[in-house]
Amino acid sequence: SKKFGAKAKRAVFKPNCRLMFGLKNKNYFSSSMDSSDGLSTTLNEMSSQSKKRFVITRMPSENDVFEFAASNKLNSNDLILNGGEEYEIVATTSKANLPKIKKDAKKHRIKLYEIGYVTKGTGVFYKRKGKLIRMKDKGWQHLQP
């Protein structure tokens, strides 16, 4: 759709940095990174650094992404996970701190996506229909031959 195309271009060419939101909530985050290299890259890096398993139960997206993917014969998960360039904050937090972050996000009209949970183990997995599917790092790779 044209609406999605305009939104996607704006995210790349005029990213909306959520610096103040990140700074205000930094004490509530147990870890955080930006998603500029793609969500799959960010989640795999966070998993590697924390030595924890990340289980994704919900793709962070609006219906327009799915509609765009379907109308252009693209895989919506590839668009969501491997695109990058949007500079959104990806963070982990405790259940106790989540309401505080949600309240601040609502106050500043920032849409939050709860996409999964962190547990013992390693790697990043997408939980679909009860099965865990490993999510590979397919985002932007710097200085690769």
Residue ranges and their predicted role:
Residues 1-145:
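Helix-biased detector of long, well-ordered alpha-helical tracts
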